[in-house]
Structures are given as structure tokens and as C-alpha cells.
Design a protein with these regions (language model features):
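Extreme N-terminal starter segment of soluble prokaryotic enzymes
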Residues: 1-3
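Class I SAM-dependent methyltransferase "Motif I" SAM/SAH-binding loop
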Residues: 6-10
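A short, Lys/Arg-enriched amphipathic alpha-helix followed by its capping loop at the start of a domain
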Residues: 16-23, 41
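The conserved SAM/SAH-binding core of class I Rossmann-like methyltransferase domains
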Residues: 27-28
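Conserved SAM/SAH-binding beta-strand->alpha-helix loop
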Residues: 31-32
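S-adenosyl-L-methionine
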Residues: 36-65
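Class I S-adenosyl-L-methionine
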Residues: 58-67, 77-211
């Protein structure tokens, strides 16, 4: 199944989809400092370097053999983040969500996934979020929106993220977010679980000698 990756960064989200069996023939990233990292991580993916606002279907289509099954991406979070500008859709970076939707409408894939920071669900952004949901609906997608925490899904990290997941309406898919495997506190994976095996090999900093 072919996936288009937008706002790809170094390709972390892409890696998850590749491990799930998807192919990502083409991706886009704006930041030149990340290009080489992405290419090393995903040598089989063609990276379109540059501003997503300037990219059209004609730029992407030549790298796809067959139909596009899905579009994934993490539009910039700074304008939504509690540690960022808090301007949401009023910030130019927040408006890049519109370009994600524009490309979605051009390809009409079976599904999409868009991820962002938990601050997007702050009350101050409610009108903007409802507008985004309406745009997805107008584009022909049934959308599910929720916030999940990585610690509930087997990760030793407190990391809350908002996910928009949509399926084309003609497919009549009723998506439900899966229950986390470690939602129960007794099953949580901690940093201790991850690095405990290093106790016999790590050298205490006080015992290290300069080279």
C-alpha cells in the first residue's frame, strides 16, 4: 500500500508505517538540516525538498506506482504547543494544516493520519479545530479525533499527542482507536525497565578518566 508522507521530519512516523507493511515512495520536508537524516533513514523514499505550499499533485505523482492508499504527516506544532506561540491557526505554521488537506483532496486516498501536540485541544483553539474537522468532512472523510499518551502504548515516556484519523466516506469504515496495551498502571513500562540491563556495563561518571 502506497503512502505519501508530508512534514516528514527525520521520518519517525514513516518508520512506524514501514514496519506495519506500508510503502512510502515519496515524502516532503521543508527543513534543509533534516534532509540527509531522512535520506539515511529512508533510502528507498524520494524526498521532495522544500515548502509544502509550493508542492502540487504533479510534483508527487511521478514517484507513485499505482494508487495512493494513505497520506500521513505531522504539520508543524509550534503554533499549537503550550511552549510555543499559542497562536494556533492565526500563525502561518498553523495554517499549513490547510495544505495537508489540499493535497489530501487532490489524491483522495483511502485514509489519512495527521498528528500534533496536545495543546491543539486547548479551549482557545476549539474554533480552529472544529474548522479543520469540517474541512476534512467536506473533503469526503469520516474523521476520528483523540489524544493518546505514549506511556499507555508500551513506551517509557509521558508523551501526549493528538491524532486525526480519517477514512474516505464511501468505504464506510467506523474507526475506533485501539486500547493501549499498558493503560493499566501495573503494566506501565518505565525507564528502569528500558536501561536496567546497563547496570553491569555502565561506568559511573566519577570513575571515568579523560582520554
Amino acid at each position: 500500500m502506497n503512502i505519501i508522507s508530508l512534514f516528514s521530519g527525520c521520518g519517525g512516523l514513516d518508520l512506524g508505517f514501514e514496519k506495519a507493511g506500508f510503502d512510502i515512495p515519496v515524502a516532503n520536508e521543508f527543513d534543509p538540516k533534516i534532509y540527509e537524516t531522512f535520506k539515511v533513514n529512508h533510502p528507498k523514499t524520494h524526498l521532495i525538498e522544500g515548502d509544502v505550499r509550493q508542492i502540487t499533485k504533479a510534483d508527487i505523482a511521478p514517484y507513485i506506482n499505482g494508487e495512493v492508499d494513505g497520506i500521513i504527516g505531522c504539520p508543524p506544532c509550534q503554533s499549537w504547543s503550550e511552549a510555543g506561540s499559542l497562536k494556533g491557526i492565526e500563525d502561518a505554521r498553523g495554517q499549513l494544516f490547510f495544505d495537508y488537506i489540499r493535497i489530501l483532496k487532490e489524491f483522495r486516498p483511502k485514509f489519512f493520519l495527521a498528528e500534533n501536540v496536545s495543546g491543539m485541544l486547548a479551549n482557545r483553539h476549539d474554533e480552529a479545530v472544529q474548522n479543520i474537522l469540517k474541512l476534512f468532512d467536506d473533503a469526503g472523510y469520516d474523521v476520528s479525533l483523540t489524544m493518546v499518551n505514549a506511556k499507555d502504548y508500551g513506551v517509557a515516556e509521558e508523551r501526549k499527542r493528538v491524532f486525526y484519523i480519517g477514512f474516505r466516506k464511501d468505504l464506510k469504515i467506523k474507526f475506533k482507536f485501539p486500547k493501549g496495551s499498558t493503560e493499566d498502571d501495573s503494566k506501565k513500562i518505565t525507564l528502569r525497565n528500558i536501561i536496567w540491563d546497563l547496570q553491569y556495563t555502565a561506568v559511573p561518571s566519577g570513575e571515568k578518566k579523560p582520554p
